[in-house]
């Protein structure tokens, strides 16, 4: 698959939150919505509750690295937003990748589904 693009506009994030499906676990929350561009676009959100800027940026780097490992398994045409939770700060890239794989499988972005709760947004 081609390299992913980054979600940058607030309207893109809001549309993904509002219309997309979500999957969550203690480490990460994932929102996914089909897009019309045929390109994978991702956004990463880290709130101030996670810690100072150094910790938030570390979380973003780890999430990006974990997604790069799964990028080849994902099909294009999705907007995906990853929301870091408090436990993300203390986890390694492999733990986040495992969590991400389960969630993306449950949302239908990749072909694996392994016991993750999926909520459909109205």
Language model features: what each stretch is:
Residues 1-122:
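Positively charged, solvent-exposed patches that mediate nucleic-acid binding
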């Amino acid at each position: 698959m081609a390299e992913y693009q980054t979600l940058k506009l607030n309207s893109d994030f809001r549309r993904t939150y509002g219309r997309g499906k979500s999957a969550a676990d203690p480490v990460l929350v994932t929102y996914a919505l089909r897009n019309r561009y045929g390109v994978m676009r991702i956004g990463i959100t880290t709130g101030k509750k996670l810690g100072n800027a150094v910790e938030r940026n570390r979380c973003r780097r780890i999430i990006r690295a974990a997604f790069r490992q799964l990028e080849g398994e994902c099909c294009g045409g999705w907007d995906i937003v990853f929301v870091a939770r408090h436990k993300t700060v203390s986890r390694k890239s492999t733990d986040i990748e495992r969590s991400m794989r389960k969630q993306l499988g449950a949302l239908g972005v990749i072909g694996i589904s392994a016991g993750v709760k999926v909520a459909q947004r109205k």
